[in-house]
UniProtKB/Swiss-Prot annotation:
The keyword Metal-binding applies. One of its GO terms (molecular function) is mRNA 5'-diphosphatase activity. The keyword Zinc-finger does not apply. It comes from Pseudomonas fluorescens (strain SBW25). Its EC number is 3.6.1.-. Belongs to the Nudix hydrolase family. RppH subfamily. Accelerates the degradation of transcripts by removing pyrophosphate from the 5'-end of triphosphorylated RNA, leading to a more labile monophosphorylated state that can stimulate subsequent ribonuclease cleavage. A motif (Nudix box) lies at residues 38-59. One of its GO terms (cellular component) is cytoplasm. Keywords: Hydrolase, Metal-binding. PANTHER family: M7GPPPN-MRNA HYDROLASE. Residues 6-149 form the Nudix hydrolase domain. Its cofactor is a divalent metal cation. This is RNA pyrophosphohydrolase.
Amino acid sequence: MIDPDGFRPNVGIILTNDAGQVLWARRINQDAWQFPQGGINPDETPEDALYRELNEEVGLEREDVQILACTRGWLRYRLPQRLVRTHSQPLCIGQKQKWFLLRLISNEQRVRMDLTGKPEFDGWRWVSYWYPLGQVVTFKREVYRRALKELAPRLLARD
């Protein structure tokens, strides 16, 4: 599903532990790291997509996490021209994302990247909250900055 402006609706997931660190996932067979994210199907709400993607990409269930916050609006990024599939219709030029800040309330051993036939990640680690800003691919950096900045007060206020 792509909107009239060419952006695919998507959810981004910032999963935190009790130390305030965030889950940072390595894309399969790449030296590229990112937060889990995924598309919203036509019959889903952003929250429905969050739980589906959380299970598909990280192996966690609804009961394993607590939603702390969600971004107020959609945050958009454009894909670099080399990643735009110019022969696909409708044309997708980027993603528009709702970001969710979650707290892991179960044991971290529940995190599994290999529960689907086509896993997106092959590794993960806990990193400091702001660490991803200097590590994520350049075209996603501004969206990460905006999401982390908007959601940071909720992480600090969680206790």
